Amino acid sequence: MTGEFSRRSFLKYTALTAVAVAGSSLLSGCEYGYNPVQNAPGTSNVVLKVRTTLDMVECHADDDGSNATTIFKLVVTNGRKNALEVTKENFAVKAEGYLAYQNDKLQVIYPDSLSYQLKQGETATYYVQAKGLNPWENGPVTLTYYPDLQYSEFSANWELTADALKSAT
């Protein structure tokens, strides 16, 4: 072998390398999106220039544990140029044997997001109510906030154990 590398050989090996790199990403998979996870009330996540702080978690239930309702108080600051519309579709609450996502179990109590949009630089407090959720019995609880539903691979998450909730109350 002379050690020379022809133009044809160069192009052939370059194409082969490109195919190998593309194939390896198909086999290994790619992690798309950004999903930070916090583990306690009072913590913040920043996703898509939207800062969200889980300020407080309250649970109300009858003495026997029935008629449980959990309320999450979220403070949202919009750092984006476009306005945010925050509705119940932006949230999901999951726990053992419990899922509230775009159904009647989940409700944004305040403010009325259909008549109010959060503009750039504005901060609003949202109360998200999960009906039928008792975090002491169904825990751990995961609250997910999707700032922009068009980019559902980006979300802010809070995984809350019973111990984290007890220390917050």
Region spans (language model):
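Short edge beta-strand/loop segments characteristic of extracellular beta-sandwich folds
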Residues: K73-T77, Q129
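Short, solvent-exposed loop/turn segments enriched in Ser/Thr/Gly
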Residues: S66-F72
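Low-complexity, acidic Ser/Thr/Pro/Gly-rich terminal tails and inter-domain linkers that flank the onset
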Residues: V37-G65
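Short, conserved catalytic or interaction motifs in soluble domains
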Residues: Y32
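N-terminal secretory signal peptides and thylakoid transit peptides that target proteins
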Residues: M1-V21, S25
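Surface-exposed edge beta-strand/loop patches
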Residues: E122-T169
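C-terminal motif of bacterial Sec signal peptides marking the signal peptidase cleavage site
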Residues: S28-G29
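The feature marks short-to-medium sequence segments in extracytoplasmic or secretory-pathway proteins
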Residues: G65-S66, T77-A124
